[in-house]
A protein has these predicted regions:
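Conserved N-terminal entry element of GNAT/NAT acetyltransferase domains
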Residues: 46-57, 77
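Helix-loop element at the rim of GNAT/NAT acetyltransferase active sites that forms part
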Residues: 53, 63-81, 97-99
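Conserved GNAT-fold acetyl-CoA-binding loop/helix
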Residues: 71-94, 105, 139-140
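Conserved beta-strand in the GNAT
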Residues: 108, 114-123, 159, 164
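Conserved acyl-donor/pantetheine-binding loop and adjacent beta-alpha core of acyl/acetyltransferases
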Residues: 123-158, 162
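C-terminal "cap" of GNAT-fold acetyltransferases
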Residues: 139, 192-206, 210-213, 218-234
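Conserved acetyl-CoA-binding loop-helix of GNAT-fold acetyltransferases
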Residues: 165, 171-188, 207-211
Length: 234
C-alpha cells in the first residue's frame, strides 16, 4: 500500500510499541487506509533534535533531570527530603533569575517540544553570587545563619554544573552534544577553560568527559563525597 507523505507530523503515539531493539517509534505519516507508519528514535533525533536556551515553562522537566543528576546534593540545596518537595523547590528556583538553578543558566535539548536533556553552565567567578538566593532560603528554613555550600567551581573557568539526559534517550549522543553546546558557549564568552565535577564512583560519566578532552585537575569534596574536578583547555 502506498504511503501518504506528511509534513512535521512526527509525534509519539501509543500505536507504536518498543521493538526488540528498544527503538521507540514516532508517527511519520499515514497510509491511504489511515494507518500510521513510524520512524525510529534515532531517525527522529537526527531530524528534529534542537538546542535552545531554557524557558520558565521547562521548569517541571528541568527539575526532574537536575534531581536525577545531582541526587543527594538536591537535598542539601533545597533543604527538602521528599522527592516531590525537592523537585517543587528546584522548579521554583528555576523560574526565578540570578541563582544557580535558574533557567537563565541552562541549555536544553528539545525534541518535538519535549525537553530530553539539560546542561547548566555559568562562569566560576559568579558561582558564589548565584548560590546566595539558595543559601538565604536554606538559612531561613533551617533557622541557621552559618549554613554554607561547598565551592564547586574555580574563578576563571566556565563551569558545567549539571548535565543530564532523559533515560529514554541515553546512549544516543545527546549528552555529548550538550557538552559541545557548553563548550561553544564558553568559547563565545571568551573563556579558555571549561570545567566540571564528576563523582569518583561514576566511571561511565568520567569516560564521557574524557572523550571530549577533559582531564582530572584535582579532587574536591561536595556534600562530603569526593569528586574529580576536570578541566578542558579550549
Amino acid at each position: 500500500m502506498k504511503k501518504k507523505a506528511t509534513t512535521k507530523r512526527h509525534k509519539q503515539n501509543k500505536y507504536f510499541e518498543n521493538d526488540s531493539d528498544e527503538n521507540f517509534y514516532y508517527i511519520a505519516g499515514y497510509t491511504d487506509g489511515g494507518a500510521p507508519y513510524g520512524i525510529t528514535r534515532e531517525e527522529i533525533i537526527a531530524q528534529e533534535l534542537k538546542f535552545r536556551g531554557a524557558v520558565k515553562k521547562d521548569a517541571r522537566k528541568a527539575a526532574e533531570l537536575i534531581h536525577i543528576a545531582i541526587a543527594d546534593i538536591a537535598e542539601k540545596l533545597t533543604g527538602q527530603t521528599k522527592k516531590e518537595n525537592i523537585r517543587e523547590t528546584m522548579a521554583n528556583f528555576f523560574r526565578e533569575e540570578n541563582n544557580r538553578l535558574s533557567y537563565q543558566n541552562m541549555i536544553v535539548a528539545d525534541l518535538l517540544g519535549e525537553v530530553v536533556g539539560i546542561v547548566i553552565i555559568y562562569p566560576g567567578e559568579v558561582a558564589s553570587r548565584l548560590d546566595e538566593p539558595i543559601l538565604k532560603q536554606l538559612r531561613k528554613k533551617r533557622r541557621n545563619e552559618v549554613i554554607f555550600l561547598d565551592k564547586e567551581a574555580d574563578e576563571g573557568d566556565f563551569y558545567i554544573d549539571t548535565v543530564c539526559v532523559d533515560d529514554r534517550f541515553r546512549g544516543r549522543g545527546i549528552g555529548t552534544m550538550l557538552l559541545k553546546e557548553a563548550e561553544k558557549a564558553a568559547s563565545q564568552k571568551g573563556y579558555s577553560r571549561l570545567s566540571l565535577n564528576v563523582a569518583q564512583d561514576n566511571p561511565i560519566a568520567k569516560k564521557l568527559y574524557e572523550s571530549i578532552g577533559c582531564k582530572k585537575d584535582k579532587v574536591i569534596k561536595i556534600n562530603e563525597h569526593p569528586y574529580d574536578y576536570m578541566v578542558k583547555i579550549l
